[in-house]
Amino acid sequence: MAILEIKKYPDEVLKKKAETISEINGDLQKLIDNMIETMYNANGIGLAAPQVGVLKRLIVVDTSPREQNQSLIVLINPEITDSEGEILSEEGCLSLPGFTTRLKRKERVIVKGLDRNGKEIEIEATGLLARALQHEIDHLDGILLIDKISPLKRELFRKKFKTKK
């Protein structure tokens, strides 16, 4: 396994829509293993393939405390099929180091996709897991945390991190 480079804003790959995965093969399994290792190495709770420069619809998520048994989720071609409620909470991103913001997300989501073996799975999530799944699925559509904040906050972000529009 290898630790991959996490792409940082404003890398253009982060703004592109990821492609549906049509074949589960050895290369994909290696990518999954490398993404898992990369996420844990960065002390993250989720990672999407575009964050490591791969435009494929693949996410890995683990919101369990590090000292407990890990509850790793690997989702291929995930999609949110149902959601309800709203909750405002603090959120950060491995591709936006040093930046956090309060953001409204759905409080409960149902996500369908394939596990790493190609088996269909459905996850009903609330709390931090629901937030992490929504965040990582946003990455698959080229949507970043800063795309969901107010124009004023976005301008302050750009000034602080010295990026252009």
Curated annotation (Swiss-Prot):
Its EC number is 3.5.1.88. Fe cation binds at residues 93, 135, 139. One of its GO terms (molecular function) is metal ion binding. The active site is at residue 136. InterPro entries: Peptide_deformylase, Peptide_deformylase_sf. One of its GO terms (biological process) is co-translational protein modification. It catalyses: N-terminal N-formyl-L-methionyl-[peptide] + H2O = N-terminal L-methionyl-[peptide] + formate. Binds 1 Fe(2+) ion. It holds the Pfam family Pep_deformylase. It is an enzyme of class 3 (hydrolase). Its cofactor is Fe(2+). Keywords: Hydrolase, Iron, Metal-binding, Protein biosynthesis. Removes the formyl group from the N-terminal Met of newly synthesized proteins. Requires at least a dipeptide for an efficient rate of reaction. N-terminal L-methionine is a prerequisite for activity but the enzyme has broad specificity at other positions. Belongs to the polypeptide deformylase family. This is Peptide deformylase. It comes from Thermodesulfovibrio yellowstonii (strain ATCC 51303 / DSM 11347 / YP87).
